[in-house]
Amino acid sequence: DYPIVFALHGKGGKNTSWVNQLKSFTDSGEFVGIYPQGHLDSWNLGTEPSKADDVAFINSIIKELENYNNLNMNKIYAIGTSNGSGMVNKLGIHTSHFKAIAPVVSQLMESMPILDNTKPVSIFQINGAKDFTIPINGGSAFGHNFLDAYKSAELWASNFECNLSPEVKSINGTVSYTHLRAHETTD
């Protein structure tokens, strides 16, 4: 059975941007790629042009995918960039479908608290110090108040009862922080 990867475009973007980036993986059968298009080319995080219920939209796609017996509904993942990254965070908070999410170049926002009933999910949060669009140290952009990227990772970790003293690795100027639950490994 094939794992499923949702790939969400950024604000103003198109779902086709992910097709070519992930084509070699989907063509080789590593997973089935799902590339939804946000209404008005954005995902509704509160201040965007779209006021669509994007959580319901993604849930409806997942419900439809349940009709295919060659898909592994226990291995659903989501990756998104920028506005799509914010939507990936929202899906991680408001749904229980995802085994892991990868928000790229965004972090949690003050308006997006992790809920008590949020199902633990693996998070691969990517931020960059040279990204001047989304403030890595927190602050306002695009009508949102972003948390500091590291604080965002800590908030996920603390809500999912992970070790708050992360494993830190630095390779060629890139630093990774890994927060594990007691029974997890990085393998």
Model feature map: region roles:
Residues 2-77, 81, 86-90, 94:
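Serine-hydrolase catalytic machinery in alpha/beta-hydrolase-like enzymes
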Residues 97-106:
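A conserved short beta-strand
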Residues 145-170:
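Acidic, glycine-rich loop-and-strand cores that form catalytic or ligand-binding grooves
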Residues 179-182, 186-187:
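Single conserved hydrophobic/aromatic residue that forms the stacking wall/gate
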Residues 125-127:
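Short beta-strand/loop motif that positions the catalytic acidic residue
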Residues 131-134:
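Acidic catalytic loop of the alpha/beta-hydrolase fold
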Residues 136-147:
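Short, flexible/disordered intra-domain loops and linkers
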